[in-house]
């Protein structure tokens, strides 16, 4: 039968599995668990109530829809600077301040410098745009025009998440190894102007940094069914595995991760992908209030915003603390699309049943997690609860290397096999029994 792997127990179980496989000593595992506990404590400072106050402020009529370059847009920028000014972050804009002006618009940039001198010049960016469409017009609104478009979800929700992440960074007892830049983009609704400007003209405090990763938050305020869309997971090998691992530290509150392969110029993550920088975007989906005056505060799912912001924070820390060199950009992501994804994940026609009743396909970006595309009826796999779309990540406590390794391991197995599978971003334990 299928069984979800609960939160703190998931960490302990994985530690035990690693130790049983001849992995790190109990001292190392104890240190890792202590670090996970400190990270969880910092993430716990990201709170729905605090985020809600920022959403309510930014989506107030007084900001007149936060159009880039407008009076309301500039007032929104001033609000953000006031919210982060006391957090001990370094201003990373021009002239010693947080602002990076361009035209009549302003990005807002705040730096948490890394703790390891050998990699502190490597920059992980966590970003979101703070502008919206003002009163709306035929080019940027679905109407009615002439009314304040408050943009509570788009993107006061993402900005609130960023401010909460800034506070969580200050709650960490020690900074991560790499530096983290919090970037609030202006001009996104006018064509990703702020992120493009930043990539073309780096402010003086950041000119000696190398951007190694970007996480973008856009419209994270309408979580439905615990499902968050994840874009960019194909921009570097193993990004799905990374986000799944981070997500499952939350245990019972782990979100359903809906990975989408498409890459469209619809938010600031696109500018970084164009520059061949590995990038993720978290997004809770479009809705009928998108770019309408009705995108208002009372519709925002604040507990959901809290969950997505905590996931983004923990992902940023995981990347910033990685011992390995920066993740490479995966050029093949540009040639992949929704149809490529459907081809990989499509159910396979019936074939030879085999001992366990499992058919899989290998994923070039995640070879260590073969995709289940066939489960034979009345097979050990079917009886154990394996379903099409699951990704097999571990067999009997040992992580897989690739599909060939999986086939070998299953061929050598006894009458029982315990698997850990990634099911839409949640880790599930499956037990297969060979009833021959």
Give residue spans per PLM region.
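Metal-dependent peptidase/peptidase-like ectodomains
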Residues: 185-287, 301
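A non-catalytic alpha/beta surface segment that caps or lines the substrate-entry region
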Residues: 57, 66-113
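His/Asp/Glu-rich mid-to-C-terminal helical/loop segments that flank catalytic regions of hydrolases
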Residues: 171, 288-337
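Conserved PDZ fold ligand-binding element
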Residues: 381-404
């Amino acid at each position: 039968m299928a069984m979800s792997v609960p939160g703190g127990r998931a960490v302990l179980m994985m530690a035990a599995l690693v130790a049983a496989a001849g992995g790190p000593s109990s001292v190392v595992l104890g240190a890792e668990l202590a670090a996970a506990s400190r990270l969880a404590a910092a993430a716990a400072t990201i709170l729905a109530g605090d985020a809600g106050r920022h959403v309510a402020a930014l989506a107030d009529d007084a900001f007149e829809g936060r159009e880039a370059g407008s009076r309301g847009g500039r007032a929104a920028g001033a609000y953000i600077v006031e919210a982060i000014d006391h957090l001990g972050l370094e201003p990373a804009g021009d002239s010693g301040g947080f602002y990076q002006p361009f035209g009549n618009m302003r990005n807002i940039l705040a730096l948490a410098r890394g703790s390891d001198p050998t990699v502190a010049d490597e920059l992980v960016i966590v970003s979101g745009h703070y502008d919206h469409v003002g009163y709306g017009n035929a080019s940027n609104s679905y109407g009615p025009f002439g009314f304040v478009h408050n943009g509570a979800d788009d993107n006061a929700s993402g900005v609130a998440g960023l401010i909460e992440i800034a506070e969580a960074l200050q709650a960490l007892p020690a900074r991560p190894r790499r530096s983290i830049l919090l970037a609030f983009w202006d001009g996104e609704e006018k064509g990703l102007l702020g992120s493009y400007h930043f990539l073309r003209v780096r402010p003086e405090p950041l000119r000696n940094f190398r951007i190694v990763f970007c996480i973008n938050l856009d419209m994270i305020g309408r979580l439905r069914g615990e499902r968050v869309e994840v874009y960019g997971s194909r921009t570097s090998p193993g990004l799905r595995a990374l986000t799944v691992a981070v997500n499952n530290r939350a245990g019972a509150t782990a979100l359903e991760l809906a990975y989408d392969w498409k890459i469209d110029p619809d938010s600031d993550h696109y500018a970084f992908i164009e520059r061949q920088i590995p990038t993720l975007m978290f997004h809770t989906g479009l809705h009928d209030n998108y770019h309408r005056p009705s995108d208002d505060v009372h519709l925002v799912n604040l507990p959901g915003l809290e969950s997505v912001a905590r996931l983004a924070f923990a992902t940023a820390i995981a990347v910033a603390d990685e011992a390995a060199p920066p993740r490479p950009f995966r050029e093949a992501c540009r040639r992949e699309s929704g149809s490529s994804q459907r081809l990989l994940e499509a159910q396979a026609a019936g074939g030879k049943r085999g001992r366990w009743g499992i058919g899989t396909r290998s994923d070039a970006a995640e070879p260590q997690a073969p995709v289940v595309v066939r489960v034979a009826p009345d097979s050990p796999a079917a009886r154990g609860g394996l379903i099409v779309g699951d990704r097999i990540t571990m067999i009997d406590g040992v992580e897989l290397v690739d599909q060939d390794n999986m086939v070998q391991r299953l061929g050598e197995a006894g009458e029982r096999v315990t698997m850990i599978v990634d099911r839409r971003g949640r880790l599930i334990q499956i037990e297969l029994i060979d009833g021959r």
